[in-house]
Curated annotation (Swiss-Prot):
This is Sprouty-related, EVH1 domain-containing protein 2. Coiled coil: none annotated. Residues 5-122 form the WH1 domain. Residues 303-411 form the SPR domain. Residues 195-248 form the KBD domain. Its main location: membrane. PROSITE patterns: KBD (PS51488), SPR (PS51227), WH1 (PS50229). Negatively regulates Ras signaling pathways and downstream activation of MAP kinases. GO terms for cellular component: plasma membrane; transport vesicle membrane. It is a peripheral membrane protein. The lineage of its organism: Eukaryota, Metazoa, Chordata, Craniata, Vertebrata. The gene is spred2. Disruption phenotype: Morpholino knockdown is associated with increased Erk phosphorylation levels and results in a high incidence of embryos showing delayed gastrulation, or delay in elongation during the segmentation stage, with reduced formation of the head and tailbud. Morphants show yolk elongation at 12 hours post-fertilization, indicating enhanced MAPK signaling. GO terms for biological process: negative regulation of ERK1 and ERK2 cascade. It is found in: Cell membrane; Cytoplasmic vesicle, Secretory vesicle membrane; Cytoplasm.
């Protein structure tokens, strides 16, 4: 039991927009919970009423249209998390099954990493502030991770409680029923200290691929967030330039430069004619230019709405984005009845996380290699169209290599 079931915004590890799903055992399918609708779902940290020295993690979902809480599920060590498709994940804990339909694979990957972080903290018992901030910075998947913000209520609480005696903690955060604990001798700490949180949402993070193969349900996804990239994170187009100063008149200064005969200087740059004794150059020497090392202009760069990677518009062609919709690939999966093989392997030969081997994999070291190919041969007897998949898939790969097939990057905004 916890006293506070509505966590603050800065207690969230990750927050995304998704549709909350519930399992219908009668039909064996998933249905939208309580009429459906887009909800804001996140993994947050809460502190139980009994200060046991560690905090719990709660998956909290609130529907956007009416602000109704439709999902509250505690993260336990025995939680079984399944990534069924790139945009649909579900989990089971305490005989309770919940699911989320995300708007994009990027949101799904971010939520998956948030759940993994919560499970790691529960397993290892590492709930210190330093590890929390470090892990959140490493988890950063664009703009779905929340950052802590100071408010007037926080400042007023700091004034009321100027000094706290914390027996087993490094510091006490000024929020009711929430503190981050670490086993240390009792000391006195003031609440006037400020802790900075440095998050780099556009820093390259470790990409965790959900599945190396395609699901038969894949028909393309769209990211409805359209998060614009701040200008301060956009790299300059030409990083080889030194300093560019645009002024009408040359700057007057007291320095003089000895005249060195060079074709770069003309008689217009000299204060006196060449035969008039010592000459003094009144202008600064020209900037040194590295010839042959200036790279080609990169052109305009944007962030892809599907894979969230930066791409160049001039070099964007088909086959560059693996997460983008590919009508030809989807058509091949449907015409060749490959979706039947995926469905059979998912329901019969998948692990607890819902992953299974590639249907066309020839890795003999796999545990169920013979069983998988026997099942595929039996399925091919019922659906002969499966024999058309290898040549069609080979032609599609050639088309991707030539730039004729495959998905293209799409800029946000």
């Amino acid at each position: 039991m916890i006293e506070e079931t509505h966590p603050n915004d800065d207690s969230y590890i990750v927050r995304v927009k998704a549709v909350v799903m519930t399992r219908d055992d009668s039909s064996g399918g998933w249905l939208a919970q309580e009429g459906g609708g887009l909800s804001r779902v996140g993994v947050c940290k809460v502190m139980p009423a009994e200060l046991t020295g560690r905090s719990d993690f709660l998956i909290h979902g609130e529907r956007l249209k009416d602000k109704q809480v439709i999902l509250e599920c505690f993260v336990r060590k025995d939680l079984i998390y399944t990534k069924a498709t790139p945009t649909f994940h579900h989990w089971k804990v305490d005989n309770k099954k919940c699911g989320l339909t995300f708007q994009s694979p990027a949101d799904a990957r971010a939520f998956d990493r948030g759940v993994r972080k919560a499970l790691e903290d529960l397993t290892e018992g590492s709930t210190t502030s330093s590890s929390t901030l470090q892990n959140e910075a490493e988890l950063g998947d664009d703009d779905v991770f929340t950052t802590a913000t100071d408010s007037s209520s926080n400042s007023s609480q700091k004034k009321d409680h100027s000094t706290q005696l914390v027996a087993t903690s490094t510091f006490y955060e000024p929020h009711p029923h929430r503190c981050i604990l670490q086993y240390r001798p009792p000391e006195r700490y003031t609440l006037d200290q400020k802790f900075s949180r440095n998050l780099f949402p556009f820093e390259d993070e470790e990409i965790v691929r959900i599945n190396p193969r395609e699901r038969w349900m894949i028909t393309g996804y769209e990211d409805y967030r359209y998060a614009a990239v701040p200008d301060k994170f956009i790299q300059p187009e030409d990083s080889d330039s030194y300093v560019q100063i645009s002024k009408n008149d040359p700057v007057k200064h007291d320095y003089t430069y000895p005249y060195v005969p060079s074709p770069d200087f003309t008689q217009c740059d000299l204060k006196r004619p060449c035969g008039g004794g010592s000459t003094v150059v009144s202008t600064q020497p020209r900037a040194f230019i590295l010839k042959g090392k200036r790279r080609k202009e990169d052109g305009e760069r944007s962030r892809c709405v599907y894979c969230r990677d930066m791409f160049n518009h001039e070099e964007n062609r088909r086959g560059q984005c693996h997460d983008a919709p590919d009508p030809i690939r989807t058509c091949i999966h449907r015409v060749s009845f490959m979706w039947c093989a995926d469905s059979m392997l998912y329901h019969c030969m998948s692990d607890p996380e819902g992953d299974y081997s590639d249907p066309c994999s020839c890795d003999t070291s796999e545990e169920r290699f013979c069983l998988r190919w026997t099942a595929l041969l039996g399925l091919a007897m019922l659906a002969p169209c499966l024999c058309c998949y290898p040549p069609l898939h080979g032609c599609h790969r050639c088309g991707v290599a030539c730039g004729c097939c495959g998905g293209k990057h799409k800029a946000v905004g």
